[in-house]
Design a protein with these regions (language model features):
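Short active-site neighborhood of thiol/selenol oxidoreductases, capturing the structured segment around
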Residues: 65-78
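A short beta-strand-turn-helix
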Residues: 50-68
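Non-catalytic, surface beta->alpha helical segment in thiol-disulfide oxidoreductase systems
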Residues: 131-132, 136-177
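Short, thiol/selenol-centered motifs that function as redox-active sites or metal-ligating centers
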Residues: 75-89
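Bacterial N-terminal signal peptides that target proteins for export
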Residues: 4-24
Length: 208
Protein backbone atom coordinates (compact mmCIF):
# COMPACT_ATOMS: atom_id res chain seq x y z
CA UNK A 1 0.00 0.00 0.00
CA UNK A 2 2.80 2.36 0.88
CA UNK A 3 4.51 1.75 -2.45
CA UNK A 4 1.29 2.42 -4.35
CA UNK A 5 0.64 5.64 -2.43
CA UNK A 6 4.17 6.84 -3.05
CA UNK A 7 3.88 6.36 -6.82
CA UNK A 8 0.52 8.08 -7.42
CA UNK A 9 1.70 11.65 -6.71
CA UNK A 10 4.73 11.16 -8.96
CA UNK A 11 2.56 9.84 -11.78
CA UNK A 12 0.10 12.68 -11.27
CA UNK A 13 2.86 15.27 -11.38
CA UNK A 14 4.23 13.81 -14.62
CA UNK A 15 0.77 13.78 -16.20
CA UNK A 16 0.09 17.30 -14.98
CA UNK A 17 3.36 18.53 -16.47
CA UNK A 18 2.50 16.83 -19.77
CA UNK A 19 -0.91 18.49 -19.86
CA UNK A 20 0.66 21.85 -19.12
CA UNK A 21 3.12 21.42 -21.99
CA UNK A 22 0.27 20.44 -24.33
CA UNK A 23 -1.77 23.43 -23.20
CA UNK A 24 1.15 25.76 -23.87
CA UNK A 25 1.67 24.18 -27.29
CA UNK A 26 -1.99 24.64 -28.26
CA UNK A 27 -1.94 28.21 -26.96
CA UNK A 28 1.14 29.02 -29.04
CA UNK A 29 -0.48 27.43 -32.09
CA UNK A 30 -3.69 29.42 -31.56
CA UNK A 31 -1.92 32.76 -31.33
CA UNK A 32 0.24 31.91 -34.35
CA UNK A 33 -2.85 31.19 -36.41
CA UNK A 34 -4.50 34.38 -35.16
CA UNK A 35 -1.45 36.42 -36.09
CA UNK A 36 -1.36 34.80 -39.53
CA UNK A 37 -5.03 35.60 -40.08
CA UNK A 38 -4.43 39.23 -39.19
CA UNK A 39 -1.37 39.50 -41.42
CA UNK A 40 -3.25 37.82 -44.29
CA UNK A 41 -5.94 40.51 -44.21
CA UNK A 42 -5.29 43.38 -46.65
CA UNK A 43 -3.75 46.42 -44.98
CA UNK A 44 -6.12 49.31 -44.34
CA UNK A 45 -9.25 47.24 -44.88
CA UNK A 46 -11.89 46.42 -42.28
CA UNK A 47 -14.11 43.66 -43.57
CA UNK A 48 -15.11 45.06 -46.94
CA UNK A 49 -14.65 48.79 -46.51
CA UNK A 50 -11.62 50.91 -45.81
CA UNK A 51 -10.08 51.54 -42.42
CA UNK A 52 -9.34 55.19 -41.71
CA UNK A 53 -5.63 55.77 -42.33
CA UNK A 54 -5.17 59.53 -42.80
CA UNK A 55 -7.69 62.17 -41.69
CA UNK A 56 -5.73 64.98 -43.31
CA UNK A 57 -5.81 63.47 -46.81
CA UNK A 58 -9.44 62.45 -46.40
CA UNK A 59 -10.31 65.98 -45.29
CA UNK A 60 -8.64 67.43 -48.37
CA UNK A 61 -10.66 65.12 -50.61
CA UNK A 62 -13.84 66.02 -48.74
CA UNK A 63 -13.28 69.74 -49.25
CA UNK A 64 -12.37 69.31 -52.92
CA UNK A 65 -15.48 67.24 -53.71
CA UNK A 66 -17.83 68.84 -51.15
CA UNK A 67 -18.63 65.37 -49.86
CA UNK A 68 -19.28 64.44 -46.23
CA UNK A 69 -17.02 61.99 -44.43
CA UNK A 70 -18.95 59.11 -42.87
CA UNK A 71 -17.10 57.28 -40.11
CA UNK A 72 -18.29 54.12 -38.41
CA UNK A 73 -16.54 53.73 -35.06
CA UNK A 74 -16.29 50.04 -34.23
CA UNK A 75 -14.16 47.29 -32.72
CA UNK A 76 -13.26 43.69 -33.47
CA UNK A 77 -15.15 42.42 -30.43
CA UNK A 78 -18.35 44.33 -31.32
CA UNK A 79 -20.94 41.96 -32.85
CA UNK A 80 -23.31 44.81 -33.76
CA UNK A 81 -20.44 46.51 -35.60
CA UNK A 82 -19.89 43.39 -37.67
CA UNK A 83 -23.60 43.21 -38.50
CA UNK A 84 -23.68 46.85 -39.54
CA UNK A 85 -20.53 46.46 -41.60
CA UNK A 86 -21.69 43.34 -43.43
CA UNK A 87 -25.30 44.35 -44.06
CA UNK A 88 -25.03 48.11 -44.64
CA UNK A 89 -21.61 49.66 -45.06
CA UNK A 90 -19.82 46.94 -47.03
CA UNK A 91 -22.52 46.87 -49.75
CA UNK A 92 -22.44 50.67 -49.89
CA UNK A 93 -18.66 50.69 -50.22
CA UNK A 94 -18.53 47.97 -52.87
CA UNK A 95 -21.61 48.87 -54.89
CA UNK A 96 -20.03 51.80 -56.71
CA UNK A 97 -22.89 54.23 -56.00
CA UNK A 98 -21.66 55.88 -52.81
CA UNK A 99 -17.89 55.97 -52.29
CA UNK A 100 -16.45 59.13 -53.83
CA UNK A 101 -19.85 60.06 -55.29
CA UNK A 102 -22.18 60.52 -52.33
CA UNK A 103 -19.76 60.29 -49.40
CA UNK A 104 -16.32 59.22 -48.21
CA UNK A 105 -16.87 56.13 -46.06
CA UNK A 106 -14.34 54.79 -43.55
CA UNK A 107 -14.21 52.47 -40.55
CA UNK A 108 -12.49 53.63 -37.36
CA UNK A 109 -11.23 50.74 -35.25
CA UNK A 110 -11.04 52.05 -31.70
CA UNK A 111 -9.08 48.96 -30.65
CA UNK A 112 -6.32 49.52 -33.21
CA UNK A 113 -2.90 50.52 -31.79
CA UNK A 114 -0.76 53.38 -33.03
CA UNK A 115 -1.65 56.78 -34.42
CA UNK A 116 -2.70 58.25 -37.76
CA UNK A 117 -2.47 61.82 -39.14
CA UNK A 118 -5.35 63.88 -37.78
CA UNK A 119 -7.23 66.57 -39.68
CA UNK A 120 -4.57 69.04 -38.56
CA UNK A 121 -1.75 66.67 -39.52
CA UNK A 122 -0.84 65.89 -35.91
CA UNK A 123 -0.72 62.27 -34.63
CA UNK A 124 -4.15 61.01 -33.65
CA UNK A 125 -4.90 57.94 -31.53
CA UNK A 126 -8.21 56.41 -32.58
CA UNK A 127 -9.25 55.19 -29.14
CA UNK A 128 -8.53 58.55 -27.52
CA UNK A 129 -10.24 60.40 -30.36
CA UNK A 130 -13.35 58.22 -30.05
CA UNK A 131 -13.47 58.93 -26.31
CA UNK A 132 -13.12 62.68 -26.89
CA UNK A 133 -15.91 62.61 -29.49
CA UNK A 134 -18.14 60.46 -27.31
CA UNK A 135 -18.06 57.82 -30.05
CA UNK A 136 -16.53 55.04 -27.95
CA UNK A 137 -19.94 53.34 -27.62
CA UNK A 138 -19.81 51.13 -30.69
CA UNK A 139 -21.13 51.20 -33.30
CA UNK A 140 -21.39 54.97 -33.65
CA UNK A 141 -21.66 56.63 -37.08
CA UNK A 142 -20.53 60.23 -37.53
CA UNK A 143 -20.96 62.66 -40.43
CA UNK A 144 -18.07 65.12 -40.71
CA UNK A 145 -16.87 67.89 -42.98
CA UNK A 146 -13.31 68.24 -44.26
CA UNK A 147 -12.25 69.90 -41.00
CA UNK A 148 -13.51 67.05 -38.84
CA UNK A 149 -16.62 68.87 -37.61
CA UNK A 150 -19.96 67.09 -37.23
CA UNK A 151 -22.46 68.34 -39.80
CA UNK A 152 -25.37 65.92 -39.31
CA UNK A 153 -26.88 63.97 -36.42
CA UNK A 154 -24.82 60.99 -35.35
CA UNK A 155 -26.28 57.48 -35.28
CA UNK A 156 -25.56 55.47 -32.13
CA UNK A 157 -26.14 51.73 -32.25
CA UNK A 158 -28.57 49.93 -34.55
CA UNK A 159 -32.26 50.57 -34.02
CA UNK A 160 -33.53 48.90 -37.20
CA UNK A 161 -31.06 47.43 -39.68
CA UNK A 162 -33.64 47.47 -42.52
CA UNK A 163 -34.15 51.22 -42.17
CA UNK A 164 -30.52 52.12 -41.46
CA UNK A 165 -29.58 53.02 -45.05
CA UNK A 166 -32.56 55.36 -45.28
CA UNK A 167 -31.37 57.05 -42.09
CA UNK A 168 -27.94 57.49 -43.65
CA UNK A 169 -29.55 59.06 -46.73
CA UNK A 170 -31.46 61.51 -44.55
CA UNK A 171 -28.34 62.54 -42.64
CA UNK A 172 -26.29 62.81 -45.83
CA UNK A 173 -28.83 65.29 -47.20
CA UNK A 174 -28.45 67.36 -44.04
CA UNK A 175 -24.68 67.24 -44.52
CA UNK A 176 -24.93 68.26 -48.19
CA UNK A 177 -26.84 71.38 -47.20
CA UNK A 178 -24.13 72.30 -44.69
CA UNK A 179 -21.43 71.79 -47.34
CA UNK A 180 -23.22 73.74 -50.05
CA UNK A 181 -23.54 70.62 -52.18
CA UNK A 182 -26.76 70.54 -54.28
CA UNK A 183 -26.82 66.73 -54.27
CA UNK A 184 -29.82 65.15 -52.57
CA UNK A 185 -30.44 61.44 -52.13
CA UNK A 186 -33.89 59.83 -52.32
CA UNK A 187 -35.22 57.78 -49.43
CA UNK A 188 -33.89 54.36 -50.43
CA UNK A 189 -30.91 52.82 -52.25
CA UNK A 190 -33.28 51.47 -54.91
CA UNK A 191 -34.55 54.96 -55.72
CA UNK A 192 -31.00 56.28 -55.68
CA UNK A 193 -29.95 53.61 -58.18
CA UNK A 194 -32.85 54.60 -60.44
CA UNK A 195 -31.79 58.23 -60.11
CA UNK A 196 -28.24 57.42 -61.18
CA UNK A 197 -29.46 55.36 -64.14
CA UNK A 198 -31.72 58.20 -65.26
CA UNK A 199 -28.84 60.66 -65.03
CA UNK A 200 -26.61 58.35 -67.06
CA UNK A 201 -29.32 57.86 -69.70
CA UNK A 202 -29.84 61.62 -70.03
CA UNK A 203 -26.18 62.30 -70.73
CA UNK A 204 -25.36 62.77 -74.44
CA UNK A 205 -23.60 59.82 -76.01
CA UNK A 206 -20.00 60.30 -77.14
CA UNK A 207 -19.70 60.96 -80.84
CA UNK A 208 -17.60 58.42 -82.79
Amino acid sequence: MAISTGRVPGTYNRLNASFQRLAMLFAALFWSLAAYAQSDRPSGVHGSFQELQDCQLLGQESRAKKLPIVLMFGAQWCEFCQTLSEQVFAPMALGGMYEGKAMLLRHVGIDEPGSIPGFDGKPLNKAKWAYELGADLTPTTLFLDGQGREIAPRIVGISNIELFTGLIHRNLNIAYAKLGNPLRLPATPELYEQQLKAQTASQPADKP
